[in-house]
Amino acid sequence: MSAARIALDTARKVSKSRDFWILFGTFFVCGLSTNGLIGTHFIPAAHDHGMNETVAASLLALVGVFDVIGTIFSGWLTDRIDPRKLLFFYYGLRGLSLFLLPSILFSTMHPSTLVFIIFYGLDWVATVPPTIMLCRHVLGVQRATVVYGWVFVGHQVGASVAAIGAAVLRVKLGDYAIAFYISATMCLVAALAVLRIAKGVNAAILRG
């Protein structure tokens, strides 16, 4: 079977799974709240509050530094803790931090802003190891990489929605506050949604 046929056949099978759509939806929120919102709009949002663009860009660069640490540590945790619980905390804390963000942006680098940057860096790709683990355990090991590929589509769609949507809200409303609050709310919904993912491998889906 060709690679394209395997990908399409896997999509057909996992599309019947509620757990797949939960993973797809929560990864949509992941992309929305990272690359789409913070990655694209943090610098202009900080600039709206009077922060120099170079300072804002430096803070965003720190996200990348702490991202490496957070991802490695999350992989270690995923081998030891229920990945659903990890995702609950990752999305939940991300949502709470986004609710706070509009109130901690200042014209200079405030300590509270730096704390946000460090946390967001640690959390940025921390969702990936437990998501991959759930693709393996819930939907089967045989095509786990293909399943994750389809879940990653949700991530990229979410990123594009936030990149465009936050810009529209900024133009219409004059600031990014509502965009941050919407993203925060979606993160909290994602945190609750992952707890509904079943335990064990749903082998029947991959056979059907």
Residue map of PLM features:
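Hydrophobic core of transmembrane alpha-helices in multi-pass small-molecule transporters
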Residues: 28-29, 112-126
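Extracytoplasmic gate region of multi-pass secondary transporters
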Residues: 15-74, 162
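A late C-terminal transmembrane helix in Major Facilitator Superfamily
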Residues: 138-173
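C-terminal ends and interior cores of transmembrane alpha-helices
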Residues: 93-106
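Cytoplasmic membrane-interface "Motif A"-like loop-to-helix N-cap segments
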Residues: 80-92
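Intracellular juxtamembrane helix-capping segments at the cytosolic ends
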Residues: 126-139
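Helix-to-loop junctions at the C-terminal end of transmembrane segments
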Residues: 71-82, 170-171
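A membrane-interface helix-boundary motif in multi-pass transporters
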Residues: 168-185
